[in-house]
Amino acid sequence: MEHPVFKRDPSEKSETERREVPPLLKLALELGPLLVFFFANARGEMLIERFPILGSIGAPIFLATALFMAATVIALAISWSMTRTLPIMPLVSGIVVLVFGALTLWLHNDTFIKMKPTIVNTLFGGILLGGLFFGKSLLGYVFDSAFRLDAEGWRKLTLRWALFFIFLAIVNEIVWRNFSTDTWVSFKVWGIMPITIVFTLLQMPLIQKHSLTDEENTAS
């Protein structure tokens, strides 16, 4: 029996199907923790001066990590309270944030939080490629997709996203290993998101080409 976090009870489908997070709020829930992370790292010293108790956490990157973890939990809680479900991608990402964030604070080593994007993107890329290897296009489960594509469309889109996730993992490794912490934080917030938006928009022709009509979807 599947846990309700991942799948709604069929008997409640008609009642809960309409429970959706408004697009702007969904964007805020996704970007909010990242913005908190960026602000806390950039203004960490100011926050510590104003609230001395925060100094016990450590340098700005550690304060940013702690607030990032808290903001992630709050975002997931808001999403759950509104929909009674948690999309698989934010859920897995949130779990990794908490695990690697805790290691960062416990060991006082920011390497762990810097590796978090690498781990998450490699995980999703590997899952998608593994699914394709076994003849399964798992992208719809990862993104909780609302659109419907034919089999060829799902295969192509899944492969593209798998390679994109791997690309993001490689880029993250290059940036955090070769640049300052401040540069890495800025790129994580202001670089990855625009790149992802552009990539997503570039997939629209493929999605439109392989989209199923209501009649085709019913027949399939």
Swiss-Prot record:
Domain of life: Bacteria
Pfam families (UniProt xref): IspA (PF04279)
Transmembrane as UniProt keyword: yes
Transmembrane segments: 20-40, 57-77, 86-106, 123-143, 156-176, 187-207
Subcellular location per the Swiss-Prot or TrEMBL entry: Cell inner membrane
Family statement drawn from the similarity comment of this UniProt entry: Belongs to the YciB family.
Protein name: Inner membrane-spanning protein YciB
Organism of this sequence: Brucella melitensis biotype 2 (strain ATCC 23457)
